Amino acid sequence: MCIRDRPKVDPQGKIQSFEALSRWFVGGQAIAPDCFVLMAERHGLMTMFSRLVLQQSVAILQQWQRQGLLYPIAINLGGPELLDDSFFAELMSLSADHPWLTQYLQLEITETNIAVQQPLLHKRLRALNQYGFSISIDDFGTGHSSLSQLVDCPADTIKIDRRFVSCIPQDSRTVRILHTTIQLAKALNLNIVAEGVESDIQRRFLQSLGCQLMQGYLFGRPAPADYWQDQLLPKSPKLELGAKKA
């Protein structure tokens, strides 16, 4: 298993941060993420799996920091990992041993996990936030969270699911939902990320709504950390729209 980083960019194409995505290659062939993640969930391996992602992401951040590159990386976590005592302790140890890392390590948890009425999960999210970790609600709009849970969750970012973005601009009802969601996020002082942006029409429309960050194939495919390091060191971190990287 290895990490491929996907950039999060502002509407002008300037890289602001990254998301760590897991990739698994067997005999030179890529295994679909949906497949191996489902297998890990079925066999109770998600905590071990997420620990590998965490460790590799921390190594990337440390490598970049030595090169003078300070770009946050988000990792995806589920409820089981955060409820695992040893995994939670590892996160807390990171904040104690390397305080600067918490400024550059964002924790993404899906709205479905946030919606679960699990007091210990919410308590641990609040503790992580108090120790400096940024919390992001992933796949926003696809779960079943109430507005009260959104207020109670210590998140500072919401990610609009690609299913909404893919409907821009042809579905007027979805467009109204997007507009309302972005206005709600602004009212709650939350940052906004739209995922699945694949066309300049979508980019410009989201920009007109005030969306702050975007990610998707329009800005480039997920790539190894060394690739982004080479891209970011010699010049200003700005991508050509439509850049591709396998």
Q: What are these regions, as identified by a protein language model?
A:
Residues 34, 40-43, 171-175:
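Short, conserved loop/turn and helix-capping segments at secondary-structure boundaries
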Residues 124:
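Conserved functional hotspot residues or short segments at active or partner-binding sites
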Residues 1-39, 76, 137, 220-223, ...:
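Active-site core of bacterial EAL-family cyclic-dinucleotide phosphodiesterase domains
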Residues 10, 14-19, 24, 45-121, ...:
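Catalytic core of bacterial c-di-GMP phosphodiesterases, primarily the EAL and HD-GYP domains
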Residues 27, 78-85, 104-119, 131-246:
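EAL-family c-di-GMP phosphodiesterase catalytic domain
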